[in-house]
Amino acid sequence: MDGRSQALESDVKKTMGVRGLINSFVCRITRVSLILGMGMVVGVGMASVNFEEAEGSNGTKGAGGATSSREELMTKSIARDAAATVVIYNSNDPEAKGLADFYCEARHVDPSQEIPLATPLSEEISRADFQSQIEEPLQREFVRRGYWKFSITPLDPDRRPALVATRIGFVALIRGLPLKIAPCAIPVGGTITQPSPYGSCNAASVDSEISLLGLFHHPLNGVIPNPYSVSPVLEPGSAKGGNPSVKKTKGGNSPAASTSFPTSGNRRKSIPPGLLCVARLDATTTDGVRAMVLDGLRVEREGLWGFGYIDLRSIKTGPYGLGDQSIRIAGESMRRAGIPVLSDDLPETIHAGFPVTDAAAYYGWYSGSIDGPFAEPSFRFLPGAVACHLHSFSASTLGDPAQGWTGPLVRHGAAASIGNVYEPYIGFTTNFGIFAWSLLAGHNLAESYYAAQPVLSWMTILVGDPLYRPYLGLLGWERDSHTSPGVSATRSQKWGKNPHDPWRDYRRIVLAHRGSTLEAASDLSHRARETHESLYLEGLGAAQSDAGQLTKAEASFNAAASLTKDPDTAFRILLERARTLEKEGKPARGAALLSKEISLARSDIQRALLDSWLTRMSKL
């Protein structure tokens, strides 16, 4: 045992004196959802929460012991998440303490749960500095504050204390902390037990290593299976499980290799108490961090209403098929929740000039740095939007507004994003399908990310408020946003002071048909004619096109084109009409349509996009 381990064990044993023994008998540790057994069970459109009562809880019980209302249950759940959150900041960053205080006030986290660390201001840190300036100080502080409960394991001949319970489950890292741990040489005499290109890699994101603070002495090389994950761990290039580069940890279970869509019942029954759900409150500016938090709070009250966009590459098989599959499932999950989804299935990323309007969610891939419409200076996501782009180095830096994807997406208004600080290999990346599904089920960002992340001690980070629940407003908890002073200015301009809101109406119609946009076709078409709103038909046409119902999609897009008065929407629907004809095997008709309606392209970038499409179709 090294000196650091001996010192920490000594501190642990001190806390296991009289106070620790008393706590082991009388304390009822607050449990946070899923990680520590709260057992949230949520369905689209409704939610129920079952959790262990914490000491001192004053929840109202009705006859038979049921909690009086679903809203009260969710309120308790949110409060317990806050009680189980620690906020970590860099004391060497002059703005970090202010951001930590701001976050604690906004999310009702007790300021006593802030933890300062003195770390370098650089994004990259050495493994030695991580251990001495982040890992060890946090472990000591968690022990000192009584966040962790230890017990001596009788079967351990060395009688070392083992972590058996915790009262924290979420960690918010404040802007200014290091982002990634640089690779280091294998020590003299050390061995590599995982023979693979990545089995010898000991680089990682700071966030991923912090999530494992309570799993002492874990191997540094390769990956560690995430016991919280419901996603498969697959060998890159293979559809089979049993990855030889998965680190073996005492008592750990290898995740099942399954591509089946997860349900709440698939959540792992036994989660190590030392596992933490970590998210990073980070942006290119401090104002960006504040906006991220405030936008999320407003969206939780009013709902996240807008289009979902997915950018596919039409790859069906092989390792890259996993990426397309996860994005496709994200889109289908949003559709089943009554959210209109627009998709791009061309091999390239969404082209510059393609109108991405009312963007509430985006999942796509694959280019090295932000491009297309997202890179345009005027582009903005809707407040509270979730935006994720799959690329090996999407989060190699968060400080450059034009490099990678994660930082730039946040700069353009997204409240949540996921990225990779170094090469993760596709089988170990976050499953966007599971992430989106979990968010739509009412879970917060941190829970959803860790459900979708197959491995830890690896390269991925979550940027956003860990407690943010983007779709809380879609689950029946929203307040009346039609008269709320915080209602979107854009929506107010479009539909007036007390408007008919087509986003809510669209969702209501789809959910009335069990979440099937295709089955709702007749009602959506009828509502479009009644309201003269193209949204119903554009969302329907996109679903029909993705389902291979191309003739029906063509009719829906044509009808949508006749209704819209918005120039950007008209140009986008033109492209969707032409692409549908191309997919039908009628590229000449698609090209003719683009030529006929060329006046809908209002800018040089849109005209350039039209020219590139005409060139492509003329070659088919």
Spell out what each predicted region is.
Residues E123-Q325, S333, S457-Y471, L475:
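Structured catalytic cores of large enzymes
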Residues P383-E447:
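C-terminal soluble interaction/assembly domains
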Residues A441-R514:
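Caspase-like cysteine protease fold
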Residues R514-G515, A547, E584:
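Structural motif corresponding to the intra-repeat A-B loop/turn of tetratricopeptide repeats
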